[in-house]
Amino acid sequence: MAFMNFGKRTLLAGDLKLNRGVDVLRDPIIGTTWFVDATNGLDANPGKTWAGAFLTMSKAFTSAASGDRIYFTGKVREQLSTPAQVFDVRVIGIGTRPRHADSTPAGGETATATWAAPASPTAASALVRVRQQGWSFENILWVGHTDNACIELYRDAESGNSERDAGHTSVIDCRFASGYNGISDIGGVPNVLVQHNRFEALTNFCILGVGNIGAGQSDWEIVDNTFDGFTNGVKISGIGCRVQNNTFTDGGTPNTTVVLNMANTSGVGMGENFVIQNFFQTSTANFNTPDVVGNATDVWAVNASIDSTSAGVGGNFEWGQPA
């Protein structure tokens, strides 16, 4: 392989491994890497190595510029808004699969990357409100508050430098363990990726989206997720979305709660969604309002209900738009 000279690198003392052994990390060509240790950091630190990590995510947010990365460990207990006019930032929890801390055995008492509400949370405020495009949240255990979302996607009607729009957000490899909503789009933002996450025990919705400033949830990809033990699943104003290879349990109260609704009534121009290759604990008889709802121009194909297959016998799939 030919050697490629990409110019200078910033060398950082410290690595991304759980043992935090001394190593050298090469910063990518564009952007700065910031570190947050919510247990042992200090906001007076420079924030550019694990040894000099910030204590709070707030400090990392005020330090970050477009294209940066923020790695964190420990338990963040803050309610924040992403900074204005800062785009394309990745917030990444270190560790393996997101988990709760355990009191025993010794060594398991500190989970590697959790984001939870503070001890005295501000009412009706999300853990993080995303206000500009291109932010990504990865490998995080979310423990939400009882009256608002873990992640809130925001959009307003301003223009120029005053415009706020959370389009192109990515939520990847996270676990939403509790709270009111998992992801809430209150403005109608486009091109959101929700991939390989687990949604559990949320008391309102796993994903809730409305049409407001934007027409609805256009060009979203909701793929490879597990929706398990929730009250209501997904309810969005879907426009040209792809919902594929997800598994859904049957909601808090079968026949009266939402499992998957692509036609939230506040949207404009809903339809042309591809809802394919999903698996539902919901029975075929309940592929209708309010459990499973589509639009006339959607493509619903190769979806399996709990009773579409008999034990030991080749099964059938659900085709066509549910009512």
Predicted features and spans:
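Right-handed parallel beta-helix/beta-solenoid
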Residues: 2-59, 305-312, 321-323
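Extracellular beta-strand solenoids
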Residues: 5-6, 11-13, 18, 36, ...
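Glycine-rich repeat segments that build the extracellular carbohydrate-interaction surface of secreted
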Residues: 34-39, 55-79, 89-96
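Short glycine/acidic-rich loop motifs that flank beta-strands on beta-rich extracellular proteins
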Residues: 68-69, 79-82, 100-104, 117-125, ...
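Intrinsically disordered, low-complexity Ser/Thr- and acidic-rich flexible linkers and loops
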Residues: 158-163
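Surface-exposed or flexible loop/turn and strand-edge residues in extracellular/cell-surface modules
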Residues: 1, 6-8, 13, 19-21, ...
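Right-handed parallel beta-helix/beta-spiral solenoid domain characteristic of secreted/periplasmic
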Residues: 88-150
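Right-handed parallel beta-helix
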Residues: 88-95, 133-144, 164-180, 189-208, ...
